[in-house]
Amino acid sequence: MEDVTLIIQGRLTQETYDFYLKTCTNFPVLISTWVDCKIDFSSLPPNFLVILSQIPEEPGAQNFHYQTVSTLTGLERIKTKYAIKVRGDEFYSNLQYIHNVLRVDPDKIHSAPVFFRAWQYSEYHISDHVIAGTTENLLIMFRACKHNFDTGKMNVSKWKIDGNFHKYVTTHAPEERITKSYLDAKAPDKFERVDGRILMKEYFDILDLNLLKPYKVKANLFRVEWYDNFLPEANYSISTIDQLFSDDPYKIPNQ
């Protein structure tokens, strides 16, 4: 796995740091966090690199700007072909599985099913809990996010009630802004001109969360966390990209 770097971004917990310190021994790991981090990095192994940055003045809605800056800071320092971005307050195992997926399908961005929303619930809403792809594509994604945050672009989305168009509202969800920024950068001639679900299937796919056990998923907005027991459909999330087209996207599989 020498051609992939794990980027751990944002606020770092001791639990997350200890987990990856124990499990990531044969490939590069970059921690991109803030100068006020209290973790002791004195015994850092040679495959780990830590970047401590000043906290941006503007957090953005749901800390979108924090995520963008910390991720981009990491991406701009790595040299590997692939990158896997995770949060500093979660952990996932079997990163070899993600690496295998990237080598088989390098053109897509591979995302976790954690709050990857159905189209009826929230258009253009991938998961930002795990984002994996080529370093080139992730740089395109987060540079576009940074540009759009700085310029105020991508702040408007459609709001639906009972599946029907209702009004335009300010986009607060970081995941929507990430998705739309990337698609606008990669496919400007198609974005918002063709069915967004088709475009999402072309550029994204969803990882199998069961293959990432043991894991810890955390939702700060809801003050909830899961250890190996996050069921996507029970949490208004989809497990496969084709569920974007489903009339019953949150039906629990095999039930």
Regions found by a protein language model. Give the residues of each.
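N-proximal low-complexity "stem/linker" segments adjacent to membrane-targeting elements
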Residues: 1-15
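Active-site-proximal specificity loops/subdomain of glycosyltransferases
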Residues: 32-77
